Amino acid sequence: MAQSGYGKILLFDDFAGPEIPVEQNLAYAAAGAAAPRIGPFKVTGDLAETDTGIINVDGKVNGWVRISGNNEDGKGVAIGTGTVFSPSLNGPIAIETRVEMAALTTRSIFIGFTDANADDVAEPQTATGTTMSPVASDYCGFVLDSQLTDSADWHAVFRGGDVTASTTSTDLDLDEDATAAESQVLRVEIDTNGTARWYVDGKLKSTQTGAISTTVVQAAIVGCWGTTTTAANLDIDYIAVEANRDWTV
């Protein structure tokens, strides 16, 4: 196949302007409405719900947006790509983001890759106490869930590769706490052979061979879902997605 100098794929947004205001979300969910986008990323989730949307955080330098999830368990919003990245054909693939939360309660956060990013995207994995429950068939990323016993820690979750992940949260705990009103840089890398790495603030926290299928096509997402009757949210400074172009197609 013919090739050119555009062999690297980089999707990036600093979120210095666009938003999908909560009070206008019904317009985006109406029949026949175009799928909402922010920069190079698509927006999925329960946009027809009352509390959901994506708003600018005015006065915060660099440009930030706030994902506003919903006040129902499992309802929320994600910013990400379509299912377009194959670890074996596009790898290494990576997603990096800088995030912050005003509080760590009443929310479930997923940052990483998943094979499921439908218009009404759900959490790739749910959690309660010390039990992780898979939802999507393939995923690899960070989870922070207020329903976990260790609700402030980031967890390294994965499914779909040669290795079966534990469903006990303590086995996946990175011992890296999120702190309310403090930002963190989170990065997930996946090699062509399915080996995954999790970084927090530039430090390698975990490596897992056979974490994810090498052939299943993935989407990169940053998502926030509610867990109770209190609306959830997540502030995002930037999202970067990196991959290599597959010249064989």
Task: Give short role names for the model-derived ranges.
Residues 95-97, 109, 184-186, 220, ...:
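Hydrophobic residues positioned within well-ordered beta-strands of beta-sheet architectures
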